[in-house]
Protein backbone atom coordinates (compact mmCIF):
# COMPACT_ATOMS: atom_id res chain seq x y z
CA UNK A 1 0.00 0.00 0.00
CA UNK A 2 1.26 3.47 -0.90
CA UNK A 3 0.11 6.61 0.85
CA UNK A 4 0.44 10.22 -0.18
CA UNK A 5 2.75 10.83 2.76
CA UNK A 6 5.51 9.17 0.75
CA UNK A 7 6.80 11.24 -2.15
CA UNK A 8 7.17 9.25 -5.37
CA UNK A 9 8.53 10.42 -8.68
CA UNK A 10 6.00 10.23 -11.48
CA UNK A 11 8.42 11.17 -14.24
CA UNK A 12 8.37 9.05 -17.34
CA UNK A 13 5.19 7.23 -16.44
CA UNK A 14 1.88 7.29 -18.23
CA UNK A 15 1.62 9.29 -21.45
CA UNK A 16 -2.15 9.07 -21.61
CA UNK A 17 -3.00 11.95 -19.31
CA UNK A 18 -6.74 12.44 -19.58
CA UNK A 19 -8.24 15.72 -20.62
CA UNK A 20 -11.47 15.04 -18.78
CA UNK A 21 -14.32 17.49 -18.88
CA UNK A 22 -16.82 18.25 -16.18
CA UNK A 23 -19.52 20.71 -15.31
CA UNK A 24 -18.46 23.75 -13.27
CA UNK A 25 -19.96 22.25 -10.14
CA UNK A 26 -20.81 18.74 -9.09
CA UNK A 27 -24.22 18.86 -7.53
CA UNK A 28 -26.23 16.11 -5.95
CA UNK A 29 -28.44 14.30 -8.43
CA UNK A 30 -31.72 16.10 -8.87
CA UNK A 31 -35.05 15.00 -10.27
CA UNK A 32 -34.51 16.42 -13.73
CA UNK A 33 -32.51 13.73 -15.46
CA UNK A 34 -31.21 15.09 -18.78
CA UNK A 35 -33.71 17.92 -18.83
CA UNK A 36 -31.27 20.67 -19.71
CA UNK A 37 -28.14 19.55 -21.52
CA UNK A 38 -25.95 22.26 -23.00
CA UNK A 39 -24.47 21.79 -26.46
CA UNK A 40 -27.64 20.30 -27.87
CA UNK A 41 -26.06 19.88 -31.28
CA UNK A 42 -24.12 17.01 -29.73
CA UNK A 43 -27.11 15.34 -28.15
CA UNK A 44 -30.23 13.50 -29.24
CA UNK A 45 -32.51 10.94 -27.68
CA UNK A 46 -33.76 7.55 -28.65
CA UNK A 47 -37.11 8.24 -27.04
CA UNK A 48 -37.95 10.80 -29.73
CA UNK A 49 -37.64 8.16 -32.45
CA UNK A 50 -40.57 7.62 -34.75
CA UNK A 51 -42.83 4.63 -34.38
CA UNK A 52 -40.87 2.86 -37.04
CA UNK A 53 -37.85 2.97 -34.81
CA UNK A 54 -35.59 5.19 -36.90
CA UNK A 55 -33.33 7.46 -34.94
CA UNK A 56 -34.11 11.18 -34.72
CA UNK A 57 -32.09 13.76 -36.56
CA UNK A 58 -28.99 14.92 -34.78
CA UNK A 59 -30.25 18.46 -34.32
CA UNK A 60 -33.39 17.34 -32.54
CA UNK A 61 -34.37 19.98 -29.98
CA UNK A 62 -35.47 17.32 -27.53
CA UNK A 63 -32.91 16.37 -24.93
CA UNK A 64 -35.17 14.77 -22.36
CA UNK A 65 -34.06 11.29 -21.36
CA UNK A 66 -36.20 10.47 -18.37
CA UNK A 67 -39.36 11.94 -16.96
CA UNK A 68 -38.08 11.53 -13.44
CA UNK A 69 -34.76 11.24 -11.67
CA UNK A 70 -35.74 8.35 -9.44
CA UNK A 71 -34.17 4.95 -10.11
CA UNK A 72 -35.91 2.87 -12.71
CA UNK A 73 -36.75 -0.64 -11.62
CA UNK A 74 -37.25 -3.94 -13.44
CA UNK A 75 -40.96 -3.53 -12.87
CA UNK A 76 -40.90 -0.15 -14.55
CA UNK A 77 -40.82 -1.60 -18.03
CA UNK A 78 -41.28 -4.94 -19.64
CA UNK A 79 -38.58 -4.03 -22.13
CA UNK A 80 -35.02 -4.86 -21.26
CA UNK A 81 -33.62 -3.94 -24.63
CA UNK A 82 -30.94 -1.55 -25.64
CA UNK A 83 -30.04 -3.29 -28.86
CA UNK A 84 -29.82 -0.67 -31.55
CA UNK A 85 -28.81 -3.14 -34.24
CA UNK A 86 -32.18 -4.72 -35.00
CA UNK A 87 -32.34 -3.27 -38.50
CA UNK A 88 -30.18 -1.38 -40.97
CA UNK A 89 -31.65 1.81 -39.52
CA UNK A 90 -30.73 0.82 -35.98
CA UNK A 91 -34.29 0.05 -34.99
CA UNK A 92 -34.40 -0.49 -31.28
CA UNK A 93 -37.03 -2.06 -29.15
CA UNK A 94 -37.16 -5.78 -28.59
CA UNK A 95 -39.41 -6.86 -25.73
CA UNK A 96 -38.01 -9.11 -23.08
CA UNK A 97 -40.54 -10.03 -20.47
CA UNK A 98 -40.22 -11.40 -16.99
CA UNK A 99 -37.04 -9.72 -15.80
CA UNK A 100 -38.51 -8.57 -12.54
CA UNK A 101 -36.99 -11.27 -10.36
CA UNK A 102 -33.72 -10.16 -8.81
CA UNK A 103 -32.92 -13.36 -6.98
CA UNK A 104 -29.92 -14.99 -8.61
CA UNK A 105 -30.75 -18.03 -10.64
CA UNK A 106 -28.08 -19.42 -12.98
CA UNK A 107 -30.65 -21.13 -15.15
CA UNK A 108 -32.72 -17.97 -15.15
CA UNK A 109 -29.81 -15.85 -16.33
CA UNK A 110 -29.09 -18.30 -19.14
CA UNK A 111 -32.75 -18.34 -20.11
CA UNK A 112 -33.10 -14.56 -20.20
CA UNK A 113 -29.84 -14.07 -22.10
CA UNK A 114 -30.88 -16.78 -24.57
CA UNK A 115 -34.29 -15.16 -24.97
CA UNK A 116 -32.71 -11.82 -25.75
CA UNK A 117 -30.20 -13.45 -28.12
CA UNK A 118 -33.02 -15.07 -30.08
CA UNK A 119 -34.79 -11.72 -30.23
CA UNK A 120 -31.66 -9.99 -31.51
CA UNK A 121 -30.93 -12.61 -34.15
CA UNK A 122 -34.45 -13.25 -35.40
CA UNK A 123 -34.62 -11.84 -38.89
CA UNK A 124 -30.95 -10.88 -38.71
CA UNK A 125 -31.20 -7.93 -41.05
CA UNK A 126 -27.47 -7.27 -40.98
CA UNK A 127 -26.75 -10.65 -42.52
CA UNK A 128 -29.75 -10.39 -44.82
CA UNK A 129 -28.36 -7.14 -46.22
CA UNK A 130 -25.72 -9.27 -47.89
CA UNK A 131 -27.95 -11.50 -49.98
CA UNK A 132 -24.93 -13.04 -51.65
CA UNK A 133 -23.86 -13.33 -55.24
CA UNK A 134 -23.08 -16.56 -57.03
CA UNK A 135 -21.83 -17.81 -60.39
CA UNK A 136 -24.22 -18.65 -63.18
CA UNK A 137 -26.42 -21.68 -62.58
CA UNK A 138 -24.51 -24.90 -62.90
CA UNK A 139 -21.15 -23.13 -63.06
CA UNK A 140 -18.36 -22.77 -60.54
CA UNK A 141 -16.51 -19.59 -59.69
CA UNK A 142 -14.07 -18.33 -62.31
CA UNK A 143 -11.52 -16.83 -59.97
CA UNK A 144 -9.38 -15.31 -62.73
CA UNK A 145 -12.43 -13.51 -64.03
CA UNK A 146 -13.38 -12.36 -60.55
CA UNK A 147 -9.86 -11.10 -59.88
CA UNK A 148 -10.05 -9.02 -63.04
CA UNK A 149 -13.26 -7.45 -61.75
CA UNK A 150 -11.92 -6.46 -58.32
CA UNK A 151 -12.15 -2.68 -58.99
CA UNK A 152 -15.90 -3.12 -59.50
CA UNK A 153 -16.57 -5.39 -56.53
CA UNK A 154 -18.01 -4.27 -53.21
CA UNK A 155 -15.43 -5.10 -50.55
CA UNK A 156 -18.03 -5.68 -47.85
CA UNK A 157 -19.89 -8.14 -50.06
CA UNK A 158 -16.70 -10.07 -50.77
CA UNK A 159 -15.80 -10.19 -47.07
CA UNK A 160 -19.23 -11.52 -46.15
CA UNK A 161 -19.18 -14.08 -48.97
CA UNK A 162 -15.79 -15.31 -47.75
CA UNK A 163 -17.18 -15.59 -44.23
CA UNK A 164 -20.29 -17.36 -45.51
CA UNK A 165 -18.09 -19.92 -47.26
CA UNK A 166 -16.11 -20.44 -44.06
CA UNK A 167 -19.34 -20.89 -42.09
CA UNK A 168 -20.60 -23.43 -44.66
CA UNK A 169 -17.33 -25.38 -44.62
CA UNK A 170 -16.74 -24.60 -48.31
CA UNK A 171 -13.01 -24.13 -47.95
CA UNK A 172 -12.19 -24.00 -51.66
CA UNK A 173 -14.56 -21.09 -52.17
CA UNK A 174 -13.35 -19.40 -49.00
CA UNK A 175 -9.72 -19.52 -50.13
CA UNK A 176 -10.77 -18.24 -53.54
CA UNK A 177 -12.40 -15.21 -51.99
CA UNK A 178 -9.37 -14.63 -49.77
CA UNK A 179 -7.21 -14.45 -52.90
CA UNK A 180 -9.59 -11.85 -54.28
CA UNK A 181 -9.50 -9.93 -51.00
CA UNK A 182 -5.72 -9.72 -51.12
CA UNK A 183 -6.11 -7.52 -54.19
CA UNK A 184 -8.70 -5.29 -52.53
CA UNK A 185 -7.41 -4.50 -49.03
CA UNK A 186 -4.69 -2.16 -47.80
CA UNK A 187 -3.46 -0.98 -44.39
CA UNK A 188 -3.16 2.55 -45.82
CA UNK A 189 -6.41 2.61 -47.81
CA UNK A 190 -9.96 3.61 -47.03
CA UNK A 191 -11.50 2.58 -43.68
CA UNK A 192 -13.10 -0.54 -45.17
CA UNK A 193 -9.86 -1.47 -46.96
CA UNK A 194 -7.92 -1.22 -43.71
CA UNK A 195 -10.52 -3.15 -41.76
CA UNK A 196 -10.72 -5.71 -44.56
CA UNK A 197 -7.02 -6.44 -44.12
CA UNK A 198 -7.53 -7.62 -40.55
CA UNK A 199 -10.84 -9.39 -41.13
CA UNK A 200 -9.34 -11.35 -44.02
CA UNK A 201 -6.42 -12.26 -41.77
CA UNK A 202 -8.89 -13.54 -39.19
CA UNK A 203 -10.71 -15.64 -41.78
CA UNK A 204 -7.48 -17.19 -43.04
CA UNK A 205 -6.43 -17.98 -39.48
CA UNK A 206 -9.79 -19.63 -38.81
CA UNK A 207 -9.54 -21.70 -42.00
CA UNK A 208 -6.07 -22.90 -41.14
CA UNK A 209 -7.03 -23.72 -37.58
CA UNK A 210 -4.37 -21.34 -36.38
CA UNK A 211 -6.57 -18.68 -34.87
CA UNK A 212 -5.19 -19.00 -31.38
CA UNK A 213 -1.63 -19.25 -32.67
CA UNK A 214 -1.96 -16.09 -34.75
CA UNK A 215 -3.66 -14.30 -31.85
CA UNK A 216 -0.82 -15.30 -29.54
CA UNK A 217 1.70 -14.35 -32.22
CA UNK A 218 0.17 -10.90 -32.46
CA UNK A 219 0.61 -10.58 -28.70
CA UNK A 220 4.16 -11.91 -28.73
CA UNK A 221 5.25 -9.70 -31.63
CA UNK A 222 4.12 -6.50 -30.04
CA UNK A 223 6.38 -3.46 -30.22
CA UNK A 224 8.35 -2.41 -27.19
CA UNK A 225 6.41 -1.15 -24.21
CA UNK A 226 7.37 2.43 -25.02
CA UNK A 227 6.24 2.02 -28.64
CA UNK A 228 2.97 0.39 -27.60
CA UNK A 229 2.33 3.23 -25.17
CA UNK A 230 2.88 5.66 -28.02
CA UNK A 231 0.35 3.85 -30.25
CA UNK A 232 -2.18 3.68 -27.43
CA UNK A 233 -1.68 7.40 -26.91
CA UNK A 234 -2.47 8.03 -30.59
CA UNK A 235 -5.82 6.24 -30.31
CA UNK A 236 -6.55 7.91 -26.98
CA UNK A 237 -6.08 11.34 -28.47
CA UNK A 238 -7.84 10.92 -31.82
CA UNK A 239 -10.86 8.93 -30.58
CA UNK A 240 -13.12 9.85 -27.64
CA UNK A 241 -14.01 6.30 -26.60
CA UNK A 242 -11.81 6.13 -23.48
CA UNK A 243 -12.43 9.77 -22.57
CA UNK A 244 -16.14 9.04 -22.76
CA UNK A 245 -15.64 6.27 -20.19
CA UNK A 246 -13.37 8.29 -17.89
CA UNK A 247 -15.41 11.48 -18.06
CA UNK A 248 -18.84 10.01 -17.41
CA UNK A 249 -17.65 7.64 -14.68
CA UNK A 250 -15.73 10.37 -12.84
CA UNK A 251 -18.71 12.70 -12.71
CA UNK A 252 -20.98 9.90 -11.48
CA UNK A 253 -18.43 8.89 -8.84
CA UNK A 254 -17.98 12.45 -7.58
CA UNK A 255 -21.72 12.88 -7.21
CA UNK A 256 -22.13 9.52 -5.46
CA UNK A 257 -19.45 10.20 -2.84
CA UNK A 258 -20.46 13.76 -2.01
CA UNK A 259 -20.26 14.13 1.76
CA UNK A 260 -18.37 10.86 2.32
CA UNK A 261 -15.20 11.07 4.41
CA UNK A 262 -13.72 7.67 3.51
CA UNK A 263 -14.00 6.49 -0.09
CA UNK A 264 -12.82 3.23 -1.67
CA UNK A 265 -12.86 3.01 -5.47
CA UNK A 266 -12.33 -0.42 -7.03
CA UNK A 267 -11.33 -0.22 -10.70
CA UNK A 268 -11.24 -3.42 -12.74
CA UNK A 269 -9.33 -1.87 -15.64
CA UNK A 270 -7.18 0.79 -14.01
CA UNK A 271 -4.61 0.69 -16.84
CA UNK A 272 -2.33 3.70 -16.29
CA UNK A 273 -4.51 5.27 -13.60
CA UNK A 274 -5.15 8.36 -15.72
CA UNK A 275 -8.81 8.59 -14.79
CA UNK A 276 -8.00 9.27 -11.16
CA UNK A 277 -5.61 12.14 -11.80
CA UNK A 278 -8.64 14.29 -12.54
CA UNK A 279 -10.67 12.79 -9.70
CA UNK A 280 -7.99 13.59 -7.12
CA UNK A 281 -7.77 17.18 -8.31
CA UNK A 282 -11.53 17.59 -8.00
CA UNK A 283 -11.62 16.06 -4.53
CA UNK A 284 -8.96 18.54 -3.41
CA UNK A 285 -11.44 21.36 -4.12
CA UNK A 286 -14.20 19.92 -1.95
CA UNK A 287 -15.53 22.41 0.62
CA UNK A 288 -14.61 21.22 4.09
CA UNK A 289 -11.67 19.19 2.83
CA UNK A 290 -11.18 16.04 0.78
CA UNK A 291 -12.02 12.53 1.95
CA UNK A 292 -9.54 9.76 2.53
CA UNK A 293 -9.34 8.14 -0.90
CA UNK A 294 -8.41 4.49 -1.26
CA UNK A 295 -8.06 3.05 -4.77
CA UNK A 296 -7.83 -0.64 -5.60
CA UNK A 297 -6.55 -1.27 -9.10
CA UNK A 298 -6.94 -4.58 -10.92
CA UNK A 299 -4.18 -5.26 -13.42
CA UNK A 300 -3.92 -6.90 -16.82
CA UNK A 301 -0.86 -8.07 -18.71
CA UNK A 302 -1.23 -5.59 -21.57
CA UNK A 303 -1.22 -2.60 -19.22
CA UNK A 304 1.77 -4.00 -17.35
CA UNK A 305 3.66 -4.37 -20.62
CA UNK A 306 2.69 -0.94 -21.94
CA UNK A 307 3.63 0.99 -18.83
CA UNK A 308 6.85 -0.97 -18.40
CA UNK A 309 6.09 -2.16 -14.89
CA UNK A 310 3.52 -3.30 -12.38
CA UNK A 311 0.75 -1.49 -10.59
CA UNK A 312 3.23 0.02 -8.16
CA UNK A 313 3.99 2.59 -10.85
CA UNK A 314 0.33 3.60 -10.93
CA UNK A 315 0.19 3.80 -7.15
CA UNK A 316 3.31 5.94 -6.99
CA UNK A 317 2.03 8.34 -9.61
CA UNK A 318 -1.35 8.78 -7.95
CA UNK A 319 0.20 9.08 -4.49
CA UNK A 320 2.52 11.84 -5.70
CA UNK A 321 -0.36 13.82 -7.14
CA UNK A 322 -2.55 13.23 -4.08
CA UNK A 323 0.18 14.50 -1.79
CA UNK A 324 0.64 17.64 -3.86
CA UNK A 325 -3.13 18.24 -3.74
CA UNK A 326 -3.48 17.52 -0.04
CA UNK A 327 -5.72 14.49 -0.56
CA UNK A 328 -5.16 11.60 1.89
CA UNK A 329 -4.53 8.61 -0.36
CA UNK A 330 -3.99 4.86 -0.21
CA UNK A 331 -3.42 2.45 -3.08
CA UNK A 332 -4.01 -1.28 -3.13
CA UNK A 333 -3.15 -3.50 -6.07
CA UNK A 334 -4.79 -6.71 -7.23
CA UNK A 335 -2.27 -8.10 -9.69
CA UNK A 336 -4.41 -10.61 -11.55
CA UNK A 337 -7.02 -11.00 -14.23
CA UNK A 338 -10.43 -9.70 -13.25
CA UNK A 339 -11.96 -13.18 -13.56
CA UNK A 340 -9.66 -14.40 -10.77
CA UNK A 341 -10.56 -11.69 -8.29
CA UNK A 342 -12.04 -12.79 -4.97
CA UNK A 343 -13.26 -10.66 -2.09
CA UNK A 344 -9.99 -11.00 -0.19
CA UNK A 345 -8.04 -9.49 -3.10
CA UNK A 346 -9.80 -6.13 -2.98
CA UNK A 347 -8.20 -4.59 0.10
CA UNK A 348 -11.52 -3.92 1.79
CA UNK A 349 -11.64 -2.06 5.09
CA UNK A 350 -14.65 -1.17 7.24
CA UNK A 351 -16.05 2.34 7.20
CA UNK A 352 -15.43 3.11 3.52
CA UNK A 353 -18.04 4.07 0.96
CA UNK A 354 -17.34 1.68 -1.92
CA UNK A 355 -17.62 2.56 -5.62
CA UNK A 356 -16.85 0.10 -8.43
CA UNK A 357 -15.79 1.04 -11.95
CA UNK A 358 -15.98 -1.32 -14.96
CA UNK A 359 -14.51 0.52 -17.99
CA UNK A 360 -14.54 -1.70 -21.10
CA UNK A 361 -13.55 -4.79 -19.12
CA UNK A 362 -16.52 -7.01 -18.27
CA UNK A 363 -16.73 -8.33 -21.84
CA UNK A 364 -13.40 -10.06 -21.21
CA UNK A 365 -14.89 -12.13 -18.39
CA UNK A 366 -15.96 -15.61 -19.59
CA UNK A 367 -19.65 -16.24 -19.08
CA UNK A 368 -21.94 -19.28 -18.92
CA UNK A 369 -21.37 -20.02 -22.61
CA UNK A 370 -17.64 -20.50 -21.99
CA UNK A 371 -17.20 -21.84 -18.48
CA UNK A 372 -19.38 -23.42 -15.83
CA UNK A 373 -17.72 -21.00 -13.42
CA UNK A 374 -19.36 -18.09 -15.27
CA UNK A 375 -16.96 -15.43 -14.01
CA UNK A 376 -18.97 -12.66 -15.68
CA UNK A 377 -21.95 -13.14 -13.38
CA UNK A 378 -19.86 -14.37 -10.44
CA UNK A 379 -18.00 -11.07 -10.41
CA UNK A 380 -21.22 -9.07 -10.47
CA UNK A 381 -22.54 -11.02 -7.48
CA UNK A 382 -19.26 -10.47 -5.66
CA UNK A 383 -19.59 -6.73 -6.21
CA UNK A 384 -23.21 -6.78 -5.05
CA UNK A 385 -22.06 -8.38 -1.78
CA UNK A 386 -19.89 -5.31 -1.12
CA UNK A 387 -22.99 -3.06 -0.99
CA UNK A 388 -21.37 -0.38 -3.16
CA UNK A 389 -22.85 3.09 -3.34
CA UNK A 390 -22.47 3.00 -7.10
CA UNK A 391 -21.29 0.81 -10.00
CA UNK A 392 -20.36 2.40 -13.32
CA UNK A 393 -20.38 0.21 -16.42
CA UNK A 394 -19.00 1.32 -19.79
CA UNK A 395 -18.97 -1.15 -22.67
CA UNK A 396 -18.89 -1.35 -26.45
CA UNK A 397 -22.39 -1.59 -27.88
CA UNK A 398 -21.85 -4.72 -29.94
CA UNK A 399 -23.30 -8.23 -29.96
CA UNK A 400 -20.46 -10.72 -30.48
CA UNK A 401 -20.55 -12.95 -27.42
CA UNK A 402 -22.81 -15.89 -28.26
CA UNK A 403 -24.03 -15.09 -31.77
CA UNK A 404 -23.27 -17.65 -34.54
CA UNK A 405 -20.10 -17.15 -36.55
CA UNK A 406 -21.59 -15.45 -39.62
CA UNK A 407 -23.73 -13.09 -37.55
CA UNK A 408 -20.72 -12.31 -35.38
CA UNK A 409 -18.61 -11.62 -38.45
CA UNK A 410 -21.17 -9.21 -39.90
CA UNK A 411 -21.61 -7.49 -36.53
CA UNK A 412 -17.84 -7.08 -36.24
CA UNK A 413 -17.73 -5.70 -39.78
CA UNK A 414 -20.47 -3.20 -38.98
CA UNK A 415 -19.02 -2.05 -35.66
CA UNK A 416 -15.41 -1.71 -36.76
CA UNK A 417 -16.34 -0.05 -40.05
CA UNK A 418 -17.70 2.78 -37.92
CA UNK A 419 -14.63 2.76 -35.70
CA UNK A 420 -12.21 2.86 -38.63
CA UNK A 421 -14.24 5.66 -40.20
CA UNK A 422 -13.98 7.63 -36.97
CA UNK A 423 -10.21 7.12 -36.91
CA UNK A 424 -10.03 8.10 -40.58
CA UNK A 425 -11.65 11.44 -39.76
CA UNK A 426 -8.79 12.31 -37.42
CA UNK A 427 -5.62 11.17 -39.20
CA UNK A 428 -4.45 10.97 -42.86
CA UNK A 429 -4.59 7.51 -44.41
CA UNK A 430 -0.83 7.35 -44.90
CA UNK A 431 -0.11 8.40 -41.32
CA UNK A 432 2.37 5.83 -39.99
CA UNK A 433 1.37 6.31 -36.37
CA UNK A 434 -2.26 5.69 -37.25
CA UNK A 435 -1.35 2.54 -39.19
CA UNK A 436 0.73 1.23 -36.29
CA UNK A 437 -1.97 2.08 -33.76
CA UNK A 438 -4.58 0.13 -35.74
CA UNK A 439 -2.24 -2.82 -36.24
CA UNK A 440 -1.14 -3.13 -32.64
CA UNK A 441 -4.17 -1.87 -30.69
CA UNK A 442 -7.20 -2.88 -32.78
CA UNK A 443 -6.30 -5.69 -35.21
CA UNK A 444 -5.64 -8.24 -32.47
CA UNK A 445 -9.17 -7.87 -31.11
CA UNK A 446 -10.66 -8.28 -34.58
CA UNK A 447 -8.64 -11.42 -35.32
CA UNK A 448 -9.62 -12.87 -31.96
CA UNK A 449 -13.34 -12.39 -32.59
CA UNK A 450 -13.15 -14.02 -36.02
CA UNK A 451 -10.50 -16.73 -35.67
CA UNK A 452 -10.94 -18.02 -32.13
CA UNK A 453 -13.64 -19.93 -30.28
CA UNK A 454 -14.48 -21.15 -26.79
CA UNK A 455 -12.06 -20.02 -24.07
CA UNK A 456 -9.56 -18.68 -26.60
CA UNK A 457 -12.05 -16.07 -27.82
CA UNK A 458 -11.67 -13.39 -25.17
CA UNK A 459 -13.39 -10.52 -27.01
CA UNK A 460 -17.05 -11.19 -26.14
CA UNK A 461 -19.07 -7.99 -26.35
CA UNK A 462 -22.68 -7.71 -25.33
CA UNK A 463 -25.24 -4.99 -25.97
CA UNK A 464 -26.62 -3.06 -23.04
CA UNK A 465 -29.83 -5.09 -23.11
CA UNK A 466 -27.85 -8.16 -22.07
CA UNK A 467 -25.84 -6.28 -19.46
CA UNK A 468 -29.12 -5.01 -18.07
CA UNK A 469 -30.35 -8.58 -17.60
CA UNK A 470 -27.11 -9.59 -15.88
CA UNK A 471 -27.07 -6.57 -13.58
CA UNK A 472 -30.71 -7.01 -12.57
CA UNK A 473 -30.28 -10.72 -11.96
CA UNK A 474 -27.26 -9.92 -9.78
CA UNK A 475 -29.42 -7.63 -7.64
CA UNK A 476 -28.74 -4.17 -9.08
CA UNK A 477 -31.15 -1.43 -10.05
CA UNK A 478 -30.41 0.90 -12.94
CA UNK A 479 -29.97 4.58 -12.14
CA UNK A 480 -30.17 7.30 -14.82
CA UNK A 481 -26.91 8.89 -15.87
CA UNK A 482 -26.85 12.38 -14.37
CA UNK A 483 -27.27 15.68 -16.14
CA UNK A 484 -23.74 16.63 -15.09
CA UNK A 485 -22.24 13.52 -16.66
CA UNK A 486 -24.11 14.12 -19.92
CA UNK A 487 -22.97 17.74 -19.91
CA UNK A 488 -19.36 16.71 -19.32
CA UNK A 489 -19.48 14.18 -22.16
CA UNK A 490 -21.02 16.79 -24.44
CA UNK A 491 -18.26 19.26 -23.62
CA UNK A 492 -15.62 16.60 -24.23
CA UNK A 493 -17.01 15.84 -27.69
CA UNK A 494 -16.51 19.44 -28.81
CA UNK A 495 -12.87 18.57 -29.43
CA UNK A 496 -13.79 15.82 -31.91
CA UNK A 497 -15.42 15.32 -35.27
CA UNK A 498 -19.03 16.49 -35.54
CA UNK A 499 -20.15 12.95 -36.42
CA UNK A 500 -19.71 11.89 -32.78
CA UNK A 501 -23.04 12.28 -31.01
CA UNK A 502 -24.63 11.47 -27.68
CA UNK A 503 -27.97 9.80 -27.18
CA UNK A 504 -29.94 8.38 -24.31
CA UNK A 505 -32.28 5.48 -23.69
CA UNK A 506 -33.70 3.99 -20.49
CA UNK A 507 -31.35 6.08 -18.37
CA UNK A 508 -28.13 5.08 -20.16
CA UNK A 509 -25.88 7.42 -22.13
CA UNK A 510 -24.82 6.34 -25.63
CA UNK A 511 -21.85 7.47 -27.70
CA UNK A 512 -22.53 7.33 -31.45
CA UNK A 513 -20.47 7.61 -34.59
CA UNK A 514 -23.00 8.91 -37.10
CA UNK A 515 -25.98 6.56 -36.64
CA UNK A 516 -24.01 3.70 -35.13
CA UNK A 517 -23.96 3.33 -31.31
CA UNK A 518 -20.38 2.64 -30.25
CA UNK A 519 -20.39 2.66 -26.44
CA UNK A 520 -22.76 2.98 -23.51
CA UNK A 521 -22.40 4.25 -19.98
CA UNK A 522 -24.85 2.94 -17.40
CA UNK A 523 -25.06 3.43 -13.64
CA UNK A 524 -26.18 0.85 -11.10
CA UNK A 525 -26.96 0.64 -7.39
CA UNK A 526 -27.68 -2.42 -5.24
CA UNK A 527 -31.35 -3.21 -5.04
CA UNK A 528 -32.51 -2.37 -1.51
CA UNK A 529 -34.49 -5.61 -1.38
Curated annotation (Swiss-Prot):
Residues 354-448 are annotated as: PFYRE. GO terms for cellular component: cytoplasm; nucleus. Residues 451-525 are annotated as: SAW. Residues 153-213 are annotated as: Leucine repeat I (LRI). Keywords: Cytoplasm, Nucleus, Transcription, Transcription regulation. Expressed in roots, hypocotyls, cotyledons, shoot apex, leaves, flowers and siliques. The keyword Transcription regulation applies. Induction: By osmotic and cold stresses, and UV-A/B. GO terms for biological process: regulation of DNA-templated transcription. It is found in: Cytoplasm; Nucleus. Residues 51-84 are annotated as: Disordered. Its main location: cytoplasm. PANTHER family: OSJNBA0084A10.13 PROTEIN-RELATED. Probable transcription factor that acts as a positive regulator of continuous red light signals downstream of phytochrome B (phyB). Required for the regulation of hypocotyl elongation during de-etiolation. May be required to modulate phytochrome A (phyA) signal transduction in a phyB-independent way. This is Scarecrow-like protein 13. It comes from Arabidopsis thaliana (Mouse-ear cress).
Amino acid sequence: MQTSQKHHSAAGLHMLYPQVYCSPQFQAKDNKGFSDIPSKENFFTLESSTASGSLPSYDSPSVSITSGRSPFSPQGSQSCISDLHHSPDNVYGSPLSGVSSLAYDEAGVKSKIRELEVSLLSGDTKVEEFSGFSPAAGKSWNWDELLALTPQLDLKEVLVEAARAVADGDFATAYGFLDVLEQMVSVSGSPIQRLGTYMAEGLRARLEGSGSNIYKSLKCNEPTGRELMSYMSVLYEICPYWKFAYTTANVEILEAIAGETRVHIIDFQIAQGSQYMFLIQELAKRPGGPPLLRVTGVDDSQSTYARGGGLSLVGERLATLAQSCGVPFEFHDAIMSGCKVQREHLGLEPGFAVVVNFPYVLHHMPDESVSVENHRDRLLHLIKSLSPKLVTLVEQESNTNTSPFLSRFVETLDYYTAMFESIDAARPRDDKQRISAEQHCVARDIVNMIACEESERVERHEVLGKWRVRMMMAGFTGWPVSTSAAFAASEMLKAYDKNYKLGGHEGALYLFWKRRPMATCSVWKPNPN
